């Protein structure tokens, strides 16, 4: 076995320190695109997590002073871009990263930018309902701001042709995707406002990914929509797609086809409204003629009412009514007098002495019966209580104790003897038994010795 050279023998501490310095000097800072897992934040405020891809992972730490500058809260499973320094934790020999900055990657970055712009514009009041302009009803001419080759334009024109072929349409072609798209959309909105050809604008495009729709999340486009003096309907993507333009626009349509529905009037609906107006005019004319006919009939009736024979007939009818009312009044008075007489007779019978005496006698008998019952009940209760007290008194009586074989001894002076220390030899004692008294003389006194209990 060969002997190791004396100058190249490493301790574990020295080896880990050397490897750490090599990693830090050779690698320096690196950028990583990875997925976060095992994220934790203890009370110290530092972040500890793992960065991984499909086949590998590495531990990572981000100290409190660095993570304060991160504008989002990392979540497990989130894709991020991390700038970090490679190092080695010497006590355990674990290779790890110290993150210095972090930002979302891919759609996560776009979503963060979307949320930040949304909050800023909301704080400025660009989304408030008070700034929304009403759509014209009906629209005289519609402007469409979209790509001239996209499916959105085809959908809008198809719906407008079906619903209202007579409605004029002005197309303001512009790119809706790519770096130049926001500038083109803003220029088209400003051109439509300058020409004043249309009284409503549709701004939008077909569906796509978040990156495809990003032109409508541009701040320049949002401010151009807000500044437009012509009402704007946003129609970007599908119903689930939401952009900044949707929040700023005067009205949001879920699709370009739906936007065309909102700004146009259906021919069939217009025909139905025309028919309803015609029906209302006919009903108004019928009502006017009916009122005139009613007025004529009323005047004719009033003229007929002034005929002398008709007036005489009315007087005779009134006389018959008065006579009938007089007969009814006499009959009513007679019925009331008869009913009054019957009531007085009933009251007189009620005050007869015999009936009052009979009722008083019955009541007296009831009281006597109730008094006897109460006395018997009270006497029984008293006897029972007396028996209970006598039994209790008997239980504590000294005489009862004597009957069980006990006796009570007292001195000649009548003092009850309880201990031997009260007596002297030659004293006379009196002892009470159950059936009498005996007298005796003390001839000897023998106190009992107290026994001590052993402690266990």
UniProtKB/Swiss-Prot annotation:
GO biological process terms on file: DNA catabolic process
UniProt keyword Transcription, yes or no: no
Catalytically driven reaction(s): Exonucleolytic cleavage in either 5'- to 3'- or 3'- to 5'-direction to yield nucleoside 5'-phosphates
Broad class of enzyme this protein falls into: hydrolase
Similarity annotation: Belongs to the XseA family.
Quaternary context: Heterooligomer composed of large and small subunits.
Protein name: Exodeoxyribonuclease 7 large subunit
Organism in which the protein naturally occurs: Erwinia tasmaniensis (strain DSM 17950 / CFBP 7177 / CIP 109463 / NCPPB 4357 / Et1/99)
